[in-house]
Design a protein with these regions (language model features):
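Short beta-strand->loop
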Residues: 29-31, 122-124, 142-168, 182-186, ...
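Ligand-binding pocket segment of bilobal, Venus flytrap-like solute-binding proteins
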Residues: 168-233
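Short helix-loop capping/hinge motifs at secondary-structure junctions, enriched
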Residues: 125-131, 150, 163-171, 248-256
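Bacterial N-terminal signal peptides that target proteins for export
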Residues: 1-9
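Extracellular/periplasmic juxtamembrane helices and adjacent flexible linkers that interface
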Residues: 249-332
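Hydrophobic h-region of N-terminal signal peptides that target proteins for export
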Residues: 11-21
Length: 332
């Protein structure tokens, strides 16, 4: 993972130098563990844009906890596109008038080029025997997961844990008892997904990491045998939508480039890149072609199976005064 961080530093330096000579520059504001995906997408899209449009294009990237990133855009971060962890963060920007209300309908599959889920990363040999969500509440199991108030990984992990009870017949009372026990065994809440990875991998804190599926694959690959990937029987279907930031692209006159960029995500080439980075492509043919990467045994439940919609889940579970606020006691 240290090597991964070093590669990212080099990539950011190269991106900065290329931006200086660009005719058009886009800023993609995304959630935390998507750096490698977007760098690869950009490397393929930029030459095509030059060939078809004749303009030199540069694409800058900004990454952090998804909710934190949404707040940054609201506060003035000049994003041309946002590729955040869920509809709730994009809607937060739309509610401030920066994105038009019909944004979900602009692109195929409700502006969803891929989807993902939350899985477990454990120490070599899985010494704590972690196979399913109830195992996380066993005495002596330390869980690493980001803060659900700031991170898409964080709130999706909370929703997944909650849903693992509700979708299998448990009551809300059962779910509250479960997440209370689980979060009492979380030693630290990092602000974003990549910070949680650092805590688990480099600092060697915790027995299990609740991670985005793509991040889990990266961790295991970089660890070279020291970590294992565990798919629980059920988890949440995570849907990271993409959108133009209308107010910014119109002011900067970058709408055409930004639209072309997002439309490219639905091409077969981009869908293959998405699969290569362990995200589940929305194109069924590409998904089937890469079936070996994505186990079919895990049941992915929709947020609508635990609440009326994403906004309702957010309000009830992690909003101010919600379940998380009542059950979580920070470690001192």
């Amino acid at each position: 993972m240290t090597r991964l961080v070093s590669k990212l530093a080099v990539a950011l330096a190269l991106a900065a130098s290329s931006a200086a000579a660009a005719d058009v520059t886009l800023l993609n504001v995304s959630y935390d563990p998507t750096r490698e995906l977007w760098r690869d997408i950009n490397d393929h899209f930029i030459p095509q844009y030059k060939k078809t449009k004749g303009d030199n294009l540069a694409i800058k990237q900004s990454h952090g906890g998804s909710s934190t990133q949404a707040r940054a855009v609201i506060d003035g971060l000049d994003a041309d596109v946002v590729t955040l962890a869920s509809v709730i963060d994009t809607d937060a920007i739309a509610q401030k008038g920066l994105i038009t209300g019909d944004w979900v309908k602009r692109l195929p599959s409700s502006s969803l080029p891929y989807y993902s889920t939350i899985v477990f990363v454990v120490r070599k040999g899985n010494p704590k025997g972690i196979k399913d969500w109830p195992d996380l509440a066993k005495p002596g199991v330390e869980i690493v997961t980001p803060n659900p108030k700031t991170s898409g990984n964080g709130y999706l992990s909370f929703f997944a844990a909650w849903g693992s009870v509700i979708t299998r017949g448990g009551s809300k009372k059962d779910a509250v008892a479960y997440v209370t026990k689980l979060y009492s065994q979380v030693p630290v809440l990092d602000s974003g997904a990549r910070g949680a990875t650092t805590t688990f991998v480099q600092k060697e804190i915790g027995d299990v990491h609740l991670a985005w599926e793509n991040e889990a694959h990266l961790e295991v690959r970089e660890a070279k045998g020291d970590l294992d990937l565990v798919y629980p029987p059920v988890s949440i279907r995570a849907e990271p939508h993409v959108a133009l930031v209308d107010a910014n692209v119109d002011r900067k006159k970058t709408r055409a480039a930004a639209e072309a960029y997002l439309k490219y995500l639905y091409t077969d080439e981009a869908q293959e890149i998405i699969a290569k980075h362990f995200y589940r492509p929305i194109n069924d043919a590409v998904l089937k072609k890469n079936a070996a990467t994505f186990p079919a045994g895990i049941k992915l439940f929709s947020v609508k199976e635990i609440a009326a919609d994403f906004a309702a889940a957010h309000k009830e579970l992690i909003g101010t005064g919600g379940v998380f606020d009542t059950i979580y006691k920070p470690k001192r």
